[in-house]
Amino acid sequence: MSKNVVVIGTQWGDEGKGKIVDWLAESVQGVVRFQGGHNAGHTLWINGKKTILRLIPSGIMHPGVTCYIGNGVVLSPEALLKEIEELEAAGLDVRSRLQISEICPLILPYHVAVDKAREARKGESKIGTTGRGIGPAYEDKVARRALRVQDLFTPDIFDAKLDEVLDYHNFVLTQYLGAQAVSANEVRDQAMALAPAIKPMVRDVSSSIFLAQQQGARFLFEGAQGALLDVDHGTYPYVTSSNCVAGAASAGAGVGPQSLDYVLGITKAYTTRVGSGPFPTELLDEVGSRLATVGKEFGSVTGRPRRCGWFDGAALKRSVRLNGISGLCITKLDVLDGLEKLQLGVGYRVNGEFRDVLPYGAHAVAQAEPVLEELPGWSESTVGVTEYSKLPLNARRYLERVAEVCGVPIDLVSTGPDRNETIVLRHPLKG
């Protein structure tokens, strides 16, 4: 029986992690975000009502669960408070159940300005960021010039750090990117105005989790984006700016690796990608359009259409190795309903040689020609099915082949957006 579970996206994000974290949260006492920022969009459907969470962990929908934003997250005070107000307007108690690490790096207006100016300058060669300042905020962290949450409550320190970092960013904005400078006074005034609302939620999150675990509390560690967007292991440079793999939960939440008992990998029954970057199994035909339409494949944060393709088992195999995945959750199986034939990626041809795992780097992936295996589809509906035996025979065969190619058992199958539309083969927290 696992006490603590890490939930990771195994593809290029948008795998349906939010629903699964929300479903699992009823069995834990705490849910922790450990990387990313408000570029993540976790969509939950509960009793037919849609909720999108960007910063706040998906466990916030459960009254008895405490939610934590760990030090690995880059935090926009403005975005955080807006999200809190939206949830409170829906009747949720948020502030008494949310703890924010005092050492989270802040996202401030100059990060957004730099992010947008860079993408505009790159034109067609742009990475495809969300334009929310995530990358520049992580750059400041690594360059040791970041302002952090704790700095909001010591104005003298905040001012000194702000003047120094803004000298740098305004030079880049005006002299290199050809954009307007950002006003230090405006940044300072906005931050100081928001600080009092944030202060009651600020904690030493690492210690809070440690002490709760000593009392027997169970935790979910909620990943954002997906392993193939990891800044080290993804299709670099078409990646996000943080580590999205399971190992990042330890550093990004401030917990020891022995606290992580089980890794649940979330994957769609097909593959999607937002923005630029190589995508070996991408479909540019009617089938791809059908997957996008039926699957409602539009980004929950940006609204951008997602590119769609066949399930890529060789890419998933890379995620399995990177994350030490204990079991898989297959989402959006119902989107494949009605397709007469399916294709499943089992490897690639790279310079005439067969490879059974996604190569490293965007250039190498762009050269990879997918090796596809054809499987029969099914005409029956899988929407809302909650028992594995009631799935169509060919749907079960498809899932079995997915598990075989990836080398990991399937523990959960999602057959619809609502938390109850889930097939449980093995419960990650109950064995």
Curated annotation (Swiss-Prot):
Gene designation per UniProt: purA
Molecular function terms from GO: adenylosuccinate synthase activity; GTP binding; magnesium ion binding
Annotated compartments: Cytoplasm
Pathway stated in the Swiss-Prot or TrEMBL entry: Purine metabolism; AMP biosynthesis via de novo pathway; AMP from IMP: step 1/2
GO biological process: 'de novo' AMP biosynthetic process; IMP metabolic process
Enzyme class (EC, first level): ligase
Protein name as it appears in the record: Adenylosuccinate synthetase
Cofactor note: Binds 1 Mg(2+) ion per subunit.
Taxonomic source organism: Bordetella avium (strain 197N)
Predominant subcellular localization, coarse grouping: cytoplasm
Pfam families hit by this protein: Adenylsucc_synt
Complex formation: Homodimer.
SUPFAM superfamilies attached to this UniProt entry: P-loop containing nucleoside triphosphate hydrolases
Catalytic activity: IMP + L-aspartate + GTP = N(6)-(1,2-dicarboxyethyl)-AMP + GDP + phosphate + 2 H(+)
Keyword terms: Cytoplasm, GTP-binding, Ligase, Magnesium, Metal-binding, Nucleotide-binding, Purine biosynthesis
